[in-house]
Amino acid sequence: MSIIYGHRGASAHAPENTLEAFALSMEMGADGFELDVHMSKDGELVVIHDETVDRTTDGTGFVRNLTLQQLKELDASASMEGFRNCRIPTLREVFTLVQDTDHIVNVEIKTDECDYPGIEEKCLALAKEMGVEDKVIYSSFNHHTLIKMRQLKPDVKLGMLFGDIMVKPWEYAKQLDVEYLHPMKMNIYVPDFAKDATAARYGINMWTINDKETISYCLEQNVGIITNYPDVAVALRAEKAK
């Protein structure tokens, strides 16, 4: 059965990567949600997609140049109608949401554009402290980060993110020692992609699947779905299960 993740939470319905979006994704029946982690100037793990705050808040500047206090003063509602005064959450705040649930958190570590020394260690230490290690899958476009995570914690769950249509990505994935492939959506239409990846013993979580046709196809292929519309994906999964 396909696992459904809210992409940056239920980001079609609430401001992306906010507690409001994550809580809504959970309410909609998603099995988990995906988020992005950067590090503030004072070393705090914060949840936001871009390297700057410009697009999703009323502020400007690089995340790495702002303290947590400065980040918390920003409105992260991105001018979405019906929302005001949403805040950039810390990863600690997000982990608190899932502590007593069965929800999965797909943490994308954003080291592909910025260097955040020690971010891998901090993510692992926080998950251990909060008792959510078994609920977390870590992914990154920086595959050196995945290698480092495996070295730090041999039993950590890892997903290899890639945006290209690769030839036999499961062969490359062996070098990284990951459990999951996290490909962009067009890979699902490569002949036998899901079949061959599954045969190679990899789980698949596809991004970002928003149209009903592709959601339905992913459900038929039994691959994980990362979507801005978890409500739509959950409804289609229930319909197909009848």
Regions found by a protein language model. Give the residues of each.
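Phosphate-group recognition and catalysis centered on beta-loop-alpha active-site segments
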Residues: M1-K242
